[in-house]
Amino acid sequence: MRFSQLIAVLKNGDAGVLSTSEGRDPELRGAASLERATADQLSFLEKGNALVGSLESSEAGAVLIPDQQELRELAERLQLAWAVCGDPRLAFAEALEQLHPKPSPQAGIHASAVIADRVQLGAGVSIGARVCIGDDTRIGPRTVIHPGVVIYGNVDIGEGCELHANAVLHPGSRIGDRCVVHSNAVVGSEGFGFVPTAKGWRKMPQTGLVVLEDGVEVGCGSTIDRPSVGETRIGSGTKIDNLVQIGHGVVTGRGCALASQVGIAGGAQLGHGVILAGQVGVANRAVIGDRAIASSKSGIHGEVAAGEVVSGYPAIPNRLWLRCSAAFSKLPEMAKQLRELKKQVSSEATGGSIEADQ
C-alpha cells in the first residue's frame, strides 16, 4: 500500500490527519517501532515521547507525528514521508488495520463440529473444527467460532462476534454484538458460592446469567462467573486483559479497562470508565465510582469516589501513597533517631546527660 493511499483512509478515521508531506510516497509493507522500522515500514511518534531523539536515527519510510513544528522540520530534513495527526497512536492503530488486515474465515460449518438440533445460526456464521454447541443456543450473523470452542446450551451470541480457540461459554451466557472472547477464556462458569453447615460446605446453585454488552473483549484465560440469582454484567466497550477473575454478581459500567491478574470479588460494582492496573484486588461488594483508577497491586475495600486515583494496600489516594512510599525507605534512619531521642529524654528525666554518661 502506498503512503498516499493509507493517508486517504486515515483521513476518514478518528485520529485526525492535519497535514502531510509532499512528493514522497513510499510503498509500505508493514509497520514497526522507530528503532526497528525499515524503508518500507511505517512508524509513529507521540507528543512528549522520550523517543524523539530516535527519529533522527530511524530508517522508517514514513512516520506519523504530533502537531509539533520541530518534528515536521526534522522529518523534512530526513526526507521522510510524514503525516501530522491529532492522535498519532490512534492513527497508528488505524494504519495497522490497513497494513495487516485480519483474515476473514469462510462462512460454513466444519465437518467435525457437533451442533445440537435446537441451535439457531445466523447468516454468514463460521464454525471451526471440533466446536461443540448445545441446544437452545442462538448465534448471530457473521460470528466466527474458532476450533475447539465449547458452547453449552441456553447461550445467546450476537452478531459479528469472535470466539477464539478453546473458549468456553456456559449456560446462561448472553453475549452482545461485536464481542471477542480469546482462547481459554471461560464465560458463565459457576460462581464460588457455598453455605457453611455443621456437615461442611453446602453448594449454592448458581442459576443466574452472565451478560457481556456490545463490544466487550475478554482476554486469554480470563473467567467471568455467573451468580446464584440475577446477573453478572460487563458494560459495553469494556476491555478485559488475560488472566482476570470476575466473581459472581459483579457489575461494571461502560468502557472499563481491567489489566492482567485483576481479581474482582462477588457483588462488586464498577462505574463507567474505571481502570484497574495489573494485580488489583477488589473486595466483596466494593463500589468504585466512574473514571476511578487503581494502580498496580492496589487492594480496594469499601468505596472509591468517582475520578479518584488510588494506590497501595489497603488502597489510599495516590498522592498520599507516594508520600508514604518515599517515607518508607527512611524508616530505619527515623527509627534510629527515635531511639536516640528516647535515650536523651530518659537521661534528662533522671537528671543526667548523654555527654556525662559517655
Curated annotation (Swiss-Prot):
Entry's EC annotation: 2.3.1.191
Q: What this chain does, per the record?
A: Catalyzes the N-acylation of UDP-3-O-acylglucosamine using 3-hydroxyacyl-ACP as the acyl donor. Is involved in the biosynthesis of lipid A, a phosphorylated glycolipid that anchors the lipopolysaccharide to the outer membrane of the cell.
**Pathway of action:** Bacterial outer membrane biogenesis; LPS lipid A biosynthesis
Q: Which NCBIfam families match?
A: lipid_A_lpxD (TIGR01853), PRK00892.1 (NF002060)
* Active-site residue numbers: 248 (proton acceptor)
Name one process (GO BP) from the record.
lipid A biosynthetic process
Its GO CC terms?
A: carboxysome; membrane
Which reaction(s) are listed as its catalytic activity? a UDP-3-O-[(3R)-3-hydroxyacyl]-alpha-D-glucosamine + a (3R)-hydroxyacyl-[ACP] = a UDP-2-N,3-O-bis[(3R)-3-hydroxyacyl]-alpha-D-glucosamine + holo-[ACP] + H(+)
Q: Which Pfam families match?
A: Hexapep (PF00132), LpxD (PF04613)
Question: Subunit structure, briefly?
Answer: Homotrimer.
List GO molecular-function terms, semicolon-separated: N-acyltransferase activity; structural constituent of carboxysome shell
Read off the lineage from the record: Bacteria, Bacillati, Cyanobacteriota, Cyanophyceae, Synechococcales
Family per similarity comment: Belongs to the transferase hexapeptide repeat family. LpxD subfamily.
Write the protein's name. UDP-3-O-acylglucosamine N-acyltransferase
UniProt entry keywords in alphabetical sequence: Acyltransferase, Lipid A biosynthesis, Lipid biosynthesis, Lipid metabolism, Repeat, Transferase
Q: Which Gene3D superfamilies match?
A: Hexapeptide repeat proteins, MurE/MurF, N-terminal domain
